[in-house]
Amino acid sequence: MPFQASETLDDQLILDGTNGFSTGVISATRPDAIPATSMESAINMDYDDFGNIVSRLGTVTLTGNAIVSNWEDIVDNWNALTSSFGSNLPINASVFSGFYFDTAASERLVIAVNDTSTKTLYYGSPGTSYAQISSSTIDPLANFVYFAQLNEKLFYADGYSSLRYITSANVNSSITAGKISRIDVINQGSNLSGVPTVTIASPPSGVTATGEAIVANDGNLVAINITNPGSGYTTAPSVNISGGGGAHAVAYVSLAAPSKPIYLTAHTNRLWCVSNNTAVTPDTLYFSDLLDGESWDPLGSIRVGGDGDPIKGLYSWFGYKLLVFKERSIWTVDSDPTQDPADWQVTLVSGNIGCSSHRSIAAVGADVFFLSRDGIRSMAQIQAGTQTSVGLALSSPINDLISRINKTKLDLCDGVFWNNRYLLAVPFVTEDPYILGTESEYSLLTENSIDISLEGALNENNAVIVYHSLARSWLGYWDNWIVNDFIPTSFSNFGPVLMFAGDIISVSAASGQVWSFNDYLPNTRLSPVAASAYLDGGATYESSVITKAYNLNEPIPDKIGYSVQLAFDNPYTTQNVPVSVSYAKDMSGTFSTIDPALSITASQKFLKAYNLISKGRWNTIQFKVNTNSGGRLCLQSTILSGFVDSVRPQQ
């Protein structure tokens, strides 16, 4: 007797799944509660131009003891550099900071190099070897160097030594203290028939300053130009105006720049900084004279807030506004250069949200992102509220990742906005326990008087948290990179290229180098970048995606799976991508392999389905797709089908 299907009697096949991962990673909640277009985890994944989730691009090394296999055939111009670029760095040297220094004379990278015995600066550019900058020694205790370019000078500080700068001729120079910074005319005199002679008193030791008078058409002395600022002055010298008709002027002396400067920032043609000297009130903000980072007026400082809350970061915002991030508050200084500094407005932005790392601050479009004590926040988010409200951090969807950051090493965090992505390099604690919340170097003391210390804590950034500004979503994190300092560059021969000082974990023979991110390479759907661009220094890394936990839109009853269909793409006709597919039931986090060696052949839409009937009953099921071959993994969709079991009255 023939069997006839009955829609009223047979179990209905129910569909569930994800047709695109446009809302990114949401990992700080139950995997079955996140949206269908999100995923629980992504490691070393990115968005392509079409919104597909795809492996991030890799890196190539640009300095140090270059390995020829790292360069391969990505770009011919870069291949030619392996024999010369950076080959003169010390064998065991590591690069821990850098800056793209662009002047009218030339463009170059200035990098801070640690060769295990001495920390010093080098300079170089693609096509040339690196050369050491004489007398540019960095303090041995410094973990990084703060750079700020003002005009044709690159100022730098390490938080322990005095302020110095590199000239456009790549020469290290010290700040000349005790020079005349300005001369103000107090009495202009009258009826001057000629230009009077200006004589400035000599210093106790050093060079005597000189100046020349400026007389207006009405016969008044209107200004005195400094022709030589001199040196060695400890107090303001007297100014004698011979034949000045009663004119009188007062000189001002520029003393030494603030001791142990940190957070160097160029803003409104001034240099700004904070002092790392513990004898200085921690909310003191220093600024140089206009257009002169060498000239620091003794009165050129502001106490922001006046409450002792330490300044943790500075950022040059729009207009004349300087953002001052303190540990527990945020302020702006409206430093209009046409006003006297005493008239600048200092305004409170937020009274209970602060910043934890100066180096995490980065402009993201018209917004500014930074790392606070409770996660990554944005200025636009804060301005949308009030000065006293505290909303969720922008990073709340990935709070579990934020909790893994070593709270004793927040100063190491380094952020950059690049190609519509906010990249924040962070020091993850690599082993449990993660959530300790310590903000000092001391261990915690439990109720049982047992010391708890951070296990697996490293003195380096071993992960990069990624936010995509166009998709407005998080992409989990990238690993295999040890990022000491992101260095955005724009060499005229190559265009914009993101580089970073650091290391690649999978390249065991490498020391800390400067690496370039391969996203500058031409890459389209029909003409993709070379497959070797998905390698880090010629070595492979693992990319993986874990989907949400699917429940066929029925949260209570158990289910029996029928099949799952995965959609991939592979634009390479000469290279298959090997991936592994696994599943986990009931949000257990324990994955069992479905297919350990799926080979994705060339196709714009490669479909693969698996039978789930043999996997037994489950309430939720999620899937993990990963590759560690260094190839390009692109997951387009995950479609699940199954049957809903009966609701059990008791179990």
Indicate where each model-derived feature is located.
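Beta-sheet repeat architectures centered on beta-propellers
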Residues: M1-A131, T137-F155, I353-S356, A363-D367, ...
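Beta-propeller and closely related beta-pinwheel folds
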Residues: S83, N88-I91, A131-L141, S174, ...
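Predominantly extracellular/luminal cell-surface or secreted proteins
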Residues: Y123-G124, I166, A201, S242, ...
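Acidic/polar residues in short coil/turn loops that connect beta-strands
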Residues: P126-G127, D158-Y160, I166-A169, D218, ...
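Hydrophobic or amphipathic alpha-helical targeting/insertion segments
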Residues: A142-S174
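Long, compositionally biased low-complexity repeat segments characteristic
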Residues: V171-I180, E431-T438
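Conserved, function-critical positions that sit in or immediately flank catalytic
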Residues: S173-L255
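Extracellular glycan-recognition/adhesion modules and their associated mucin-like linkers
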Residues: R182, I224, P261-Y263, N493
